[in-house]
Amino acid sequence: MKKVYISCYSNEHQKYKNTLLDYGKNKKLFLTNFSNEKDFDFLNTNNTDDEIIKSVKLKILKDSDVSIFLIGKETSSRKIIDWELRASMINYGVLKNCGIIVVYLPEITDEFKEKIPRSVLPEILYKNISNPDCHIVETTWNRINKEVGHLEKLLNLALCYKDLSKYKIDKNIKIKNSSKYNMF
């Protein structure tokens, strides 16, 4: 059974995360690794960038096969999302990189319809989606919600892609939260 980590920024998005968790549990589709913002309290300003990412990999993502990122209006501005993405992209000891699924939430699709700008994404994700050597799965919440079996297809696809993807991880780790959208 796949191990899945679901990243969401705010309490407003928790309902989407809970829906995915319930669906996964009911269908026996995946096991989850959980976290909340307090789980990141072990990190402090004395940690180096590498220590932060490795700690997130070891203590938060653990042995996840796939990471699902719920993308809302504030997601790109959050440092913890940046850390989770970077930790999802690295191999560290026996812990391998994760397949990545991006789910655009209704607050994004309602505003932008089908022409979602890359600026809604965290920078590290934007750069890797644009990289032909990376295979990141994208979908919308509406599609997952309407199409039975869509999530299972996405999980299987992301799992296949994880070993093919050559993520590029820059040194621009986010050390504090920033404004709403990235400007590249």
Give names to the regions the model predicted.
Residues 98-116:
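Short beta-alpha junction loops
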Residues 89-98:
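Arginine/glycine-rich "motif VI" loop of SF2 helicases in the C-terminal RecA-like domain
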Residues 11-15, 74-77, 108-110:
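Short acidic, S/G/P-rich loop/turn micro-motifs used as interaction or catalytic elements
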Residues 74-90:
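Conserved TIR/SEFIR loop-to-helix hotspot centered on a Trp-containing motif
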Residues 16-18, 79-83, 111-115:
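A short acidic (Asp/Glu
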Residues 3, 48, 110-184:
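C-terminal interaction surface of TIR/SEFIR-family domains
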Residues 1-66, 163-184:
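Conserved N-terminal substructure of TIR/SEFIR domains
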